[in-house]
Curated annotation (Swiss-Prot):
Keyword hit for Cytoplasm: yes
Positions of region (Insert): 320-347
Domain of life from the UniProt record: Bacteria
Pfam families assigned to the protein according to its UniProt record, in alphabetical order: Anticodon_2 (PF19269), tRNA-synt_1c (PF00749)
Official protein name in the record: Glutamate--tRNA ligase
Organism for this UniProt entry: Leptospira interrogans serogroup Icterohaemorrhagiae serovar Lai (strain 56601)
GO cellular component: cytosol
Protein backbone atom coordinates (compact mmCIF):
# COMPACT_ATOMS: atom_id res chain seq x y z
CA UNK A 1 0.00 0.00 0.00
CA UNK A 2 1.12 3.55 -0.66
CA UNK A 3 1.41 6.17 2.07
CA UNK A 4 -1.28 8.31 0.48
CA UNK A 5 -4.44 7.46 -1.45
CA UNK A 6 -3.92 10.53 -3.60
CA UNK A 7 -2.05 9.73 -6.82
CA UNK A 8 1.23 11.64 -6.88
CA UNK A 9 3.54 11.45 -9.88
CA UNK A 10 6.73 13.32 -10.69
CA UNK A 11 9.08 14.30 -13.47
CA UNK A 12 12.68 14.74 -12.38
CA UNK A 13 14.91 15.97 -15.23
CA UNK A 14 18.59 16.74 -15.03
CA UNK A 15 19.29 20.33 -16.15
CA UNK A 16 22.09 19.34 -18.52
CA UNK A 17 20.46 19.89 -21.91
CA UNK A 18 17.18 20.44 -23.71
CA UNK A 19 13.90 18.74 -22.91
CA UNK A 20 14.00 16.09 -25.63
CA UNK A 21 11.45 13.69 -27.07
CA UNK A 22 11.85 10.91 -24.49
CA UNK A 23 11.88 13.30 -21.56
CA UNK A 24 8.84 15.16 -22.88
CA UNK A 25 6.87 11.91 -23.13
CA UNK A 26 7.86 10.93 -19.59
CA UNK A 27 6.75 14.31 -18.26
CA UNK A 28 3.50 14.13 -20.20
CA UNK A 29 2.59 10.59 -19.09
CA UNK A 30 3.17 11.53 -15.44
CA UNK A 31 1.18 14.74 -15.78
CA UNK A 32 -1.73 13.13 -17.63
CA UNK A 33 -2.04 10.21 -15.23
CA UNK A 34 -2.03 12.50 -12.19
CA UNK A 35 -4.69 14.74 -13.77
CA UNK A 36 -6.90 11.83 -14.87
CA UNK A 37 -6.84 10.47 -11.32
CA UNK A 38 -7.45 13.81 -9.63
CA UNK A 39 -3.94 13.72 -8.19
CA UNK A 40 -0.83 15.90 -8.11
CA UNK A 41 2.06 16.24 -10.54
CA UNK A 42 5.42 17.24 -9.07
CA UNK A 43 8.43 18.71 -10.86
CA UNK A 44 11.80 18.04 -9.25
CA UNK A 45 15.19 19.10 -10.61
CA UNK A 46 17.99 16.53 -10.27
CA UNK A 47 21.12 18.69 -10.41
CA UNK A 48 23.47 16.58 -8.31
CA UNK A 49 25.79 16.20 -11.32
CA UNK A 50 27.28 19.65 -10.83
CA UNK A 51 29.68 19.29 -13.78
CA UNK A 52 26.82 19.01 -16.28
CA UNK A 53 24.02 21.04 -14.70
CA UNK A 54 23.50 24.58 -15.99
CA UNK A 55 21.13 27.44 -15.21
CA UNK A 56 20.33 27.88 -18.92
CA UNK A 57 19.25 24.26 -19.20
CA UNK A 58 17.07 24.63 -16.10
CA UNK A 59 15.29 27.60 -17.67
CA UNK A 60 14.84 25.82 -21.02
CA UNK A 61 13.28 22.78 -19.33
CA UNK A 62 10.77 24.97 -17.52
CA UNK A 63 9.98 26.89 -20.71
CA UNK A 64 9.50 23.61 -22.61
CA UNK A 65 7.12 22.15 -20.04
CA UNK A 66 5.08 25.35 -19.94
CA UNK A 67 4.82 25.38 -23.75
CA UNK A 68 3.70 21.75 -23.71
CA UNK A 69 1.00 22.59 -21.18
CA UNK A 70 2.51 20.30 -18.56
CA UNK A 71 1.92 22.46 -15.49
CA UNK A 72 3.20 21.22 -12.16
CA UNK A 73 1.31 21.40 -8.87
CA UNK A 74 4.49 21.41 -6.79
CA UNK A 75 8.05 22.28 -7.69
CA UNK A 76 10.27 25.20 -8.73
CA UNK A 77 8.49 28.57 -8.98
CA UNK A 78 5.32 27.27 -7.28
CA UNK A 79 6.71 25.65 -4.11
CA UNK A 80 4.87 22.99 -2.16
CA UNK A 81 4.67 21.08 1.10
CA UNK A 82 7.58 18.73 0.42
CA UNK A 83 10.28 21.08 -0.89
CA UNK A 84 12.86 22.10 -1.67
CA UNK A 85 12.36 20.64 -5.16
CA UNK A 86 15.93 21.10 -6.39
CA UNK A 87 18.24 18.28 -5.29
CA UNK A 88 21.32 20.44 -4.65
CA UNK A 89 19.25 22.22 -1.99
CA UNK A 90 18.46 18.90 -0.25
CA UNK A 91 21.99 17.74 0.63
CA UNK A 92 21.36 17.90 4.39
CA UNK A 93 18.37 15.61 3.94
CA UNK A 94 20.44 12.98 2.11
CA UNK A 95 23.17 13.29 4.72
CA UNK A 96 20.67 12.53 7.48
CA UNK A 97 19.51 9.34 5.77
CA UNK A 98 23.07 8.31 4.95
CA UNK A 99 24.01 8.51 8.62
CA UNK A 100 20.98 6.37 9.43
CA UNK A 101 22.03 3.68 6.93
CA UNK A 102 25.64 3.74 8.17
CA UNK A 103 24.53 3.45 11.78
CA UNK A 104 22.28 0.49 10.96
CA UNK A 105 25.15 -1.18 9.02
CA UNK A 106 23.06 -1.13 5.85
CA UNK A 107 25.76 0.95 4.18
CA UNK A 108 29.50 1.43 4.59
CA UNK A 109 32.32 3.72 3.57
CA UNK A 110 34.39 2.55 0.62
CA UNK A 111 37.96 3.87 0.44
CA UNK A 112 38.84 2.30 -2.91
CA UNK A 113 40.55 4.67 -5.32
CA UNK A 114 39.34 5.15 -8.87
CA UNK A 115 42.46 3.35 -10.10
CA UNK A 116 41.75 0.34 -7.89
CA UNK A 117 38.16 0.14 -9.12
CA UNK A 118 39.25 0.38 -12.76
CA UNK A 119 41.72 -2.46 -12.18
CA UNK A 120 38.93 -4.63 -10.74
CA UNK A 121 36.73 -3.90 -13.77
CA UNK A 122 39.52 -4.81 -16.20
CA UNK A 123 40.14 -8.04 -14.32
CA UNK A 124 36.45 -8.97 -14.67
CA UNK A 125 36.55 -8.17 -18.38
CA UNK A 126 39.63 -10.35 -18.83
CA UNK A 127 37.80 -13.21 -17.13
CA UNK A 128 34.71 -12.64 -19.27
CA UNK A 129 32.39 -12.10 -16.32
CA UNK A 130 30.21 -9.08 -15.39
CA UNK A 131 31.85 -6.70 -12.94
CA UNK A 132 30.40 -6.81 -9.42
CA UNK A 133 32.11 -4.87 -6.64
CA UNK A 134 33.74 -7.30 -4.22
CA UNK A 135 32.80 -5.50 -0.99
CA UNK A 136 36.42 -5.01 0.06
CA UNK A 137 35.59 -2.51 2.82
CA UNK A 138 32.17 -3.88 3.78
CA UNK A 139 33.33 -5.38 7.07
CA UNK A 140 35.89 -2.86 8.28
CA UNK A 141 35.79 -2.19 12.02
CA UNK A 142 34.75 1.20 13.33
CA UNK A 143 38.33 1.77 14.45
CA UNK A 144 39.71 1.08 10.97
CA UNK A 145 37.16 3.44 9.44
CA UNK A 146 37.97 6.22 11.91
CA UNK A 147 41.69 5.85 11.25
CA UNK A 148 41.20 6.31 7.51
CA UNK A 149 38.91 9.27 8.12
CA UNK A 150 41.60 10.88 10.32
CA UNK A 151 44.08 10.42 7.47
CA UNK A 152 41.72 12.33 5.20
CA UNK A 153 41.40 9.47 2.72
CA UNK A 154 38.55 10.17 0.26
CA UNK A 155 35.65 7.76 0.36
CA UNK A 156 32.27 7.01 -1.15
CA UNK A 157 29.37 5.35 0.63
CA UNK A 158 28.10 2.01 -0.66
CA UNK A 159 24.82 0.28 0.06
CA UNK A 160 25.25 -3.24 1.43
CA UNK A 161 23.16 -5.22 -1.04
CA UNK A 162 21.36 -8.25 0.44
CA UNK A 163 21.33 -11.34 -1.76
CA UNK A 164 17.75 -12.08 -2.80
CA UNK A 165 15.37 -12.42 -5.72
CA UNK A 166 13.22 -9.37 -6.48
CA UNK A 167 9.94 -9.66 -8.37
CA UNK A 168 8.67 -6.38 -9.80
CA UNK A 169 5.07 -6.17 -11.00
CA UNK A 170 5.48 -3.36 -13.49
CA UNK A 171 2.23 -1.76 -14.70
CA UNK A 172 3.42 -1.77 -18.32
CA UNK A 173 6.18 -4.39 -18.55
CA UNK A 174 4.47 -6.98 -16.36
CA UNK A 175 6.36 -9.28 -13.99
CA UNK A 176 10.15 -8.76 -14.05
CA UNK A 177 12.64 -10.77 -11.95
CA UNK A 178 16.03 -9.56 -10.71
CA UNK A 179 18.81 -11.36 -8.82
CA UNK A 180 20.45 -8.82 -6.52
CA UNK A 181 23.72 -10.79 -6.36
CA UNK A 182 24.37 -9.52 -9.88
CA UNK A 183 24.15 -5.93 -8.64
CA UNK A 184 26.72 -5.90 -5.87
CA UNK A 185 27.23 -3.17 -3.31
CA UNK A 186 26.50 0.05 -5.19
CA UNK A 187 27.48 3.64 -4.45
CA UNK A 188 24.84 5.84 -2.83
CA UNK A 189 27.07 8.82 -1.97
CA UNK A 190 29.90 9.83 -4.30
CA UNK A 191 33.32 10.93 -3.10
CA UNK A 192 32.34 14.58 -3.69
CA UNK A 193 29.59 14.23 -1.09
CA UNK A 194 26.74 14.32 -3.58
CA UNK A 195 24.20 11.47 -3.60
CA UNK A 196 24.06 9.05 -6.50
CA UNK A 197 21.07 9.12 -8.84
CA UNK A 198 19.41 6.00 -7.42
CA UNK A 199 19.83 7.11 -3.82
CA UNK A 200 18.59 10.69 -4.20
CA UNK A 201 15.62 9.50 -6.27
CA UNK A 202 14.46 7.11 -3.56
CA UNK A 203 14.85 9.58 -0.69
CA UNK A 204 13.04 12.29 -2.65
CA UNK A 205 10.24 10.07 -3.95
CA UNK A 206 9.65 8.67 -0.46
CA UNK A 207 9.56 12.06 1.27
CA UNK A 208 7.44 13.60 -1.50
CA UNK A 209 4.99 10.68 -1.18
CA UNK A 210 5.22 9.68 -4.84
CA UNK A 211 2.76 6.85 -5.50
CA UNK A 212 3.58 6.08 -9.15
CA UNK A 213 6.97 6.20 -10.88
CA UNK A 214 6.35 6.45 -14.63
CA UNK A 215 9.45 6.58 -16.82
CA UNK A 216 11.17 5.09 -19.87
CA UNK A 217 11.99 1.40 -20.07
CA UNK A 218 15.69 2.29 -20.01
CA UNK A 219 15.30 2.92 -16.28
CA UNK A 220 14.00 -0.58 -15.56
CA UNK A 221 17.49 -1.74 -14.57
CA UNK A 222 17.60 0.96 -11.86
CA UNK A 223 14.46 -0.36 -10.22
CA UNK A 224 15.94 -3.22 -8.12
CA UNK A 225 18.50 -0.88 -6.53
CA UNK A 226 15.74 1.57 -5.71
CA UNK A 227 13.46 -1.08 -4.23
CA UNK A 228 16.30 -2.29 -1.99
CA UNK A 229 16.79 1.28 -0.77
CA UNK A 230 13.06 1.73 -0.09
CA UNK A 231 13.12 -1.43 2.00
CA UNK A 232 16.27 -0.39 3.87
CA UNK A 233 14.84 3.04 4.67
CA UNK A 234 11.49 1.58 5.74
CA UNK A 235 9.35 3.31 3.13
CA UNK A 236 6.47 1.93 1.10
CA UNK A 237 7.40 1.11 -2.49
CA UNK A 238 5.58 3.07 -5.22
CA UNK A 239 4.08 1.43 -8.27
CA UNK A 240 6.39 1.36 -11.28
CA UNK A 241 5.45 1.81 -14.93
CA UNK A 242 8.19 1.69 -17.55
CA UNK A 243 7.04 3.08 -20.90
CA UNK A 244 8.01 1.44 -24.18
CA UNK A 245 11.11 2.20 -26.19
CA UNK A 246 10.73 4.86 -28.90
CA UNK A 247 11.98 3.81 -32.35
CA UNK A 248 12.44 5.66 -35.62
CA UNK A 249 10.88 5.00 -39.02
CA UNK A 250 13.47 2.26 -39.65
CA UNK A 251 12.29 0.37 -36.56
CA UNK A 252 15.57 0.98 -34.76
CA UNK A 253 15.97 2.70 -31.42
CA UNK A 254 15.62 6.43 -31.91
CA UNK A 255 19.17 7.68 -32.30
CA UNK A 256 20.62 9.83 -29.55
CA UNK A 257 20.89 12.64 -32.09
CA UNK A 258 17.28 12.43 -33.28
CA UNK A 259 16.01 11.76 -29.80
CA UNK A 260 17.90 14.78 -28.51
CA UNK A 261 15.85 17.15 -30.64
CA UNK A 262 14.52 19.86 -28.34
CA UNK A 263 10.73 19.95 -28.26
CA UNK A 264 11.00 23.73 -28.60
CA UNK A 265 12.27 23.08 -32.13
CA UNK A 266 8.77 21.82 -32.96
CA UNK A 267 7.32 25.01 -31.51
CA UNK A 268 9.67 27.02 -33.73
CA UNK A 269 8.63 24.90 -36.72
CA UNK A 270 5.02 25.97 -36.26
CA UNK A 271 3.45 23.09 -34.35
CA UNK A 272 0.90 23.98 -31.70
CA UNK A 273 1.44 22.67 -28.15
CA UNK A 274 -1.96 20.94 -28.32
CA UNK A 275 -0.75 19.01 -31.37
CA UNK A 276 2.55 17.94 -29.88
CA UNK A 277 0.90 16.85 -26.64
CA UNK A 278 -1.59 14.75 -28.57
CA UNK A 279 1.17 13.18 -30.67
CA UNK A 280 3.44 12.41 -27.72
CA UNK A 281 0.58 10.82 -25.78
CA UNK A 282 0.11 8.32 -28.61
CA UNK A 283 3.72 7.12 -28.36
CA UNK A 284 2.92 3.96 -26.44
CA UNK A 285 -0.65 4.64 -25.29
CA UNK A 286 -4.08 4.16 -26.88
CA UNK A 287 -7.50 5.41 -25.88
CA UNK A 288 -10.25 2.91 -25.00
CA UNK A 289 -12.21 3.73 -28.17
CA UNK A 290 -9.18 3.94 -30.47
CA UNK A 291 -9.54 7.65 -31.19
CA UNK A 292 -6.28 9.45 -31.95
CA UNK A 293 -7.34 13.07 -32.31
CA UNK A 294 -7.95 14.15 -28.73
CA UNK A 295 -8.34 17.94 -28.55
CA UNK A 296 -8.72 20.24 -25.57
CA UNK A 297 -8.52 18.61 -22.16
CA UNK A 298 -9.67 15.15 -23.28
CA UNK A 299 -6.25 13.64 -22.59
CA UNK A 300 -6.34 14.85 -18.99
CA UNK A 301 -9.69 13.11 -18.53
CA UNK A 302 -9.08 9.74 -20.18
CA UNK A 303 -5.35 8.93 -19.96
CA UNK A 304 -4.65 5.72 -18.07
CA UNK A 305 -1.12 4.38 -17.71
CA UNK A 306 -2.56 0.85 -17.55
CA UNK A 307 -3.39 1.19 -21.27
CA UNK A 308 0.24 1.74 -22.25
CA UNK A 309 1.83 -0.93 -24.42
CA UNK A 310 5.24 -2.44 -23.86
CA UNK A 311 5.76 -2.76 -27.62
CA UNK A 312 8.09 -0.15 -29.18
CA UNK A 313 6.36 3.03 -30.36
CA UNK A 314 7.31 4.68 -33.65
CA UNK A 315 8.38 8.31 -33.77
CA UNK A 316 7.50 8.95 -37.42
CA UNK A 317 8.34 12.66 -37.52
CA UNK A 318 11.57 12.19 -39.47
CA UNK A 319 11.93 10.44 -42.82
CA UNK A 320 13.28 6.92 -42.91
CA UNK A 321 17.07 6.91 -43.45
CA UNK A 322 18.17 5.57 -46.85
CA UNK A 323 21.19 3.75 -45.45
CA UNK A 324 21.53 1.66 -42.32
CA UNK A 325 23.89 4.11 -40.61
CA UNK A 326 22.65 7.30 -42.21
CA UNK A 327 21.25 10.19 -40.21
CA UNK A 328 18.45 12.10 -41.95
CA UNK A 329 19.60 15.19 -40.08
CA UNK A 330 23.22 15.94 -39.26
CA UNK A 331 22.56 18.86 -36.95
CA UNK A 332 19.52 18.53 -34.72
CA UNK A 333 19.81 22.12 -33.51
CA UNK A 334 19.49 23.48 -37.06
CA UNK A 335 15.83 24.27 -37.77
CA UNK A 336 16.37 24.26 -41.53
CA UNK A 337 17.83 20.75 -41.47
CA UNK A 338 15.10 19.53 -39.15
CA UNK A 339 12.39 20.98 -41.40
CA UNK A 340 13.90 19.34 -44.48
CA UNK A 341 14.06 15.98 -42.70
CA UNK A 342 10.42 16.05 -41.59
CA UNK A 343 8.18 13.27 -42.86
CA UNK A 344 5.25 15.05 -44.61
CA UNK A 345 2.99 12.05 -44.00
CA UNK A 346 3.69 11.79 -40.28
CA UNK A 347 0.95 11.41 -37.72
CA UNK A 348 2.23 14.66 -36.24
CA UNK A 349 1.30 16.51 -39.44
CA UNK A 350 -2.11 14.83 -39.58
CA UNK A 351 -2.84 15.82 -35.99
CA UNK A 352 -1.46 19.30 -36.61
CA UNK A 353 -3.78 19.87 -39.56
CA UNK A 354 -6.77 18.67 -37.52
CA UNK A 355 -5.79 20.92 -34.61
CA UNK A 356 -5.31 24.03 -36.76
CA UNK A 357 -8.65 23.39 -38.48
CA UNK A 358 -10.62 22.85 -35.29
CA UNK A 359 -8.95 25.19 -32.82
CA UNK A 360 -10.57 28.51 -31.96
CA UNK A 361 -9.38 30.98 -34.62
CA UNK A 362 -8.17 33.50 -32.03
CA UNK A 363 -5.89 30.83 -30.53
CA UNK A 364 -4.53 30.00 -33.99
CA UNK A 365 -3.86 33.69 -34.69
CA UNK A 366 -2.17 34.14 -31.32
CA UNK A 367 0.27 31.33 -32.11
CA UNK A 368 0.73 32.50 -35.72
CA UNK A 369 1.78 36.09 -34.92
CA UNK A 370 5.46 35.30 -34.11
CA UNK A 371 5.85 33.83 -37.59
CA UNK A 372 4.54 37.02 -39.21
CA UNK A 373 6.64 39.58 -37.36
CA UNK A 374 9.78 39.36 -39.52
CA UNK A 375 7.87 39.37 -42.81
CA UNK A 376 8.39 42.74 -44.50
CA UNK A 377 5.94 41.77 -47.26
CA UNK A 378 3.05 41.81 -44.77
CA UNK A 379 1.75 45.23 -43.61
CA UNK A 380 2.41 46.00 -39.94
CA UNK A 381 -1.25 46.74 -39.21
CA UNK A 382 -2.18 43.22 -40.33
CA UNK A 383 0.04 41.63 -37.68
CA UNK A 384 -2.68 41.79 -35.08
CA UNK A 385 -4.98 39.05 -33.80
CA UNK A 386 -7.94 41.41 -34.17
CA UNK A 387 -7.23 42.34 -37.80
CA UNK A 388 -10.27 41.23 -39.87
CA UNK A 389 -8.25 40.69 -43.06
CA UNK A 390 -5.76 38.42 -41.30
CA UNK A 391 -8.61 36.53 -39.67
CA UNK A 392 -10.34 36.08 -43.03
CA UNK A 393 -7.18 34.83 -44.75
CA UNK A 394 -6.29 32.35 -42.01
CA UNK A 395 -9.89 31.11 -41.81
CA UNK A 396 -9.73 30.45 -45.56
CA UNK A 397 -6.41 28.60 -45.67
CA UNK A 398 -6.08 26.83 -42.32
CA UNK A 399 -7.63 23.65 -43.67
CA UNK A 400 -4.51 23.30 -45.87
CA UNK A 401 -1.89 23.92 -43.16
CA UNK A 402 0.27 21.21 -41.61
CA UNK A 403 1.99 23.78 -39.41
CA UNK A 404 1.91 27.53 -38.87
CA UNK A 405 5.13 28.24 -40.80
CA UNK A 406 3.14 27.59 -43.98
CA UNK A 407 0.67 30.40 -43.27
CA UNK A 408 2.80 33.57 -43.78
CA UNK A 409 3.24 32.90 -47.52
CA UNK A 410 -0.54 32.81 -47.96
CA UNK A 411 -0.92 36.02 -45.98
CA UNK A 412 1.87 37.77 -47.90
CA UNK A 413 0.48 36.73 -51.28
CA UNK A 414 -2.75 38.58 -50.55
CA UNK A 415 -0.88 41.86 -50.16
CA UNK A 416 1.20 41.74 -53.36
CA UNK A 417 0.44 45.02 -55.16
CA UNK A 418 3.38 45.43 -57.50
CA UNK A 419 3.42 42.13 -59.37
CA UNK A 420 6.76 41.61 -61.10
CA UNK A 421 8.02 38.73 -63.20
CA UNK A 422 10.69 37.06 -61.09
CA UNK A 423 12.95 35.42 -63.69
CA UNK A 424 13.69 34.68 -67.34
CA UNK A 425 12.32 31.19 -66.74
CA UNK A 426 8.99 32.68 -65.69
CA UNK A 427 8.88 34.90 -68.79
CA UNK A 428 9.53 31.79 -70.87
CA UNK A 429 6.44 30.08 -69.46
CA UNK A 430 4.40 33.10 -70.56
CA UNK A 431 5.83 33.64 -74.03
CA UNK A 432 6.99 30.25 -75.29
CA UNK A 433 4.93 27.52 -76.92
CA UNK A 434 1.30 27.47 -75.89
CA UNK A 435 1.87 29.79 -72.92
CA UNK A 436 0.10 32.86 -74.42
CA UNK A 437 -2.87 30.72 -75.48
CA UNK A 438 -3.22 29.18 -72.00
CA UNK A 439 -3.10 32.60 -70.31
CA UNK A 440 -5.70 34.01 -72.73
CA UNK A 441 -8.10 31.12 -72.22
CA UNK A 442 -7.72 31.26 -68.44
CA UNK A 443 -8.39 35.01 -68.51
CA UNK A 444 -11.48 34.66 -70.71
CA UNK A 445 -13.02 31.74 -68.85
CA UNK A 446 -12.35 33.41 -65.49
CA UNK A 447 -13.87 36.69 -66.68
CA UNK A 448 -17.07 34.90 -67.70
CA UNK A 449 -17.48 32.70 -64.64
CA UNK A 450 -17.82 33.16 -60.90
CA UNK A 451 -15.53 30.66 -59.11
CA UNK A 452 -15.47 30.75 -55.29
CA UNK A 453 -13.89 27.57 -53.97
CA UNK A 454 -10.77 25.55 -54.65
CA UNK A 455 -12.92 23.00 -56.50
CA UNK A 456 -14.34 25.77 -58.69
CA UNK A 457 -10.82 26.81 -59.68
CA UNK A 458 -9.71 23.23 -60.27
CA UNK A 459 -12.65 22.79 -62.64
CA UNK A 460 -11.90 26.10 -64.33
CA UNK A 461 -8.28 25.12 -65.00
CA UNK A 462 -9.39 21.71 -66.25
CA UNK A 463 -11.64 23.49 -68.73
CA UNK A 464 -8.68 25.62 -69.88
CA UNK A 465 -6.74 22.40 -70.37
CA UNK A 466 -9.51 20.90 -72.50
CA UNK A 467 -9.72 23.99 -74.72
CA UNK A 468 -5.94 24.39 -75.19
CA UNK A 469 -5.00 20.72 -75.19
CA UNK A 470 -2.46 21.36 -72.43
CA UNK A 471 -1.97 19.57 -69.12
CA UNK A 472 0.49 19.38 -66.25
CA UNK A 473 3.39 21.80 -66.42
CA UNK A 474 2.40 23.37 -69.76
CA UNK A 475 -1.02 24.18 -68.31
CA UNK A 476 -0.23 25.29 -64.77
CA UNK A 477 3.07 27.11 -65.21
CA UNK A 478 1.78 29.84 -67.59
CA UNK A 479 -1.20 30.42 -65.28
CA UNK A 480 1.07 30.59 -62.22
CA UNK A 481 3.47 32.98 -63.96
CA UNK A 482 0.63 35.27 -65.09
CA UNK A 483 -1.04 35.44 -61.67
CA UNK A 484 1.96 35.41 -59.28
CA UNK A 485 5.01 36.38 -61.35
CA UNK A 486 6.76 33.27 -60.01
CA UNK A 487 7.58 29.79 -61.26
CA UNK A 488 6.95 28.13 -57.88
CA UNK A 489 4.82 28.75 -54.85
CA UNK A 490 1.52 27.97 -53.20
CA UNK A 491 -0.93 25.56 -54.78
CA UNK A 492 -3.03 27.56 -57.21
CA UNK A 493 -6.45 26.11 -56.28
CA UNK A 494 -5.75 27.13 -52.68
CA UNK A 495 -4.35 30.55 -53.54
CA UNK A 496 -6.97 31.65 -56.07
CA UNK A 497 -10.04 31.67 -53.77
CA UNK A 498 -8.00 33.76 -51.36
CA UNK A 499 -7.15 36.38 -53.99
CA UNK A 500 -10.57 36.36 -55.64
CA UNK A 501 -11.64 36.82 -59.24
CA UNK A 502 -11.10 40.59 -59.55
CA UNK A 503 -7.59 40.56 -58.14
CA UNK A 504 -6.64 37.66 -60.43
CA UNK A 505 -7.93 39.49 -63.51
CA UNK A 506 -6.00 42.61 -62.51
CA UNK A 507 -2.81 40.60 -62.08
CA UNK A 508 -3.14 38.97 -65.49
CA UNK A 509 -3.76 42.36 -67.11
CA UNK A 510 -0.64 43.79 -65.44
CA UNK A 511 1.43 40.79 -66.53
CA UNK A 512 0.12 41.25 -70.07
CA UNK A 513 1.34 44.85 -70.19
CA UNK A 514 4.71 43.96 -68.69
CA UNK A 515 5.43 41.09 -71.07
CA UNK A 516 3.60 42.23 -74.20
CA UNK A 517 1.19 39.29 -74.24
CA UNK A 518 -2.05 40.43 -75.83
CA UNK A 519 -5.30 39.47 -74.15
CA UNK A 520 -8.53 38.79 -76.04
CA UNK A 521 -11.16 41.51 -75.76
Amino acid sequence: MNQSKEVRTRFAPSPSGFLHVGGARTALFNYLYAKSQGGKFILRIEDTDQNRSTEDSFKIILESLKWLGVNWDEGPEVGGEYGPYIQSQRLNIYKEYTEKLLKEKKAYRCFCTQEELEAKKKQSEAMGVPYVYDGLHANMSDEEVQEKLKQGIPYSVRFKTPSKTLIINDIIQGKVKFETKLIGDFIIVKSDGFPSYNYAVVVDDALMKITHVIRGVGHLSNTPRQILLYEALGYNIPEFAHASEIVGMDGKKLSKRAGATSILAFRDLGYLPETFRNYMALLGWTSTDGREFLPGDELEKIFDVHRCSKSPSTFDVFKKPKGSDEEVVTNFSDLTQIAEAMNPKSKLNWLSNRTIRDLNISKVLENLLPFLMDRKDIPAEVKNVNNPILTSIVESVRVYLDNLTQAPDYVAEFFVTDLKIQSEETIGFLKDGEGPKVVNEFYEILKNSDPKTDEDYKNLMSKVGEVTGQKGKTLYMPIRAATTGKSAGLELPILFPLLGKEKLLQRIEKTSKETGISLSN
